[in-house]
Amino acid sequence: MHPEASKKLEVRQADEALSCTLQVAVQTPAHSALAGLLSYGAPAPLPPGTLVRVPLGTREVLGIVWDAPPPDAAVPAGMPELRPIAGVLADLAPLDAHWRALVAFAARYYQRGLGEVALAALPAQLRGLGPAQMARRLRRPGSPAPGVETTELIALSEEQESARAQIHSKTGPFLLFGSTGSGKTEVYLRCVQDLLHADPGAQALVMVPEINLTPQLQERFVARFGAGQVVALHSGMTNPQRLKSWLAAHSGQARIVLGT
């Protein structure tokens, strides 16, 4: 072998050296022998919540780095069976600690595998994307994000203003009771608007009782906040639609999510 070629090969091997162990959640059934977190090798630590592509048997699947690696997470000597991660979806922000805590609670409560619940909570189409495909999707231009207020506001009635003030007075659940046409939706709109004005990083989740009611409510929210700020997520959408909405919400581009 030419000395120059040998030198290049040595540099590549050094770059790909597995110097860290990652604990990764993958989609396996609770009764499987692989139901817990799986260990993979990586060149460097990755933040918890990072989405990665990992080998699983003869397949390559999506996984989630679950725990921060301990200080002694270096790959022990003499462990050639530790498989390396195949890729990192570095263009996608890690799934935050609150999301991971909710998934862990659901897995314990329903006695399911952690990865089984975690991966099922992500859009189905996301599970098939590699790093290059994800980068291309995120480079696609999205809808412009206008200001929080896009329509002229109507004056609230005394009852509506009272309900709005009570909701802002303290945290906790509230029941807004009123007959059809009494103006409940406008109170919801104002409360969401107040939240988004008060905290530039805040997002609002609005739950709708039925899928067929979503388009009508979405029209109201889009008229108030703009199309780039509002997305819907429900089982009546196609996989590409669900992925597009999820990416907009996860990236913070969409600040309001309508769900069922």
Sequence positions of predicted segments:
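Accessory, non-ATPase domains that flank or precede helicase/AAA+ motor cores in DNA-metabolism machines
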Residues: M1-T260
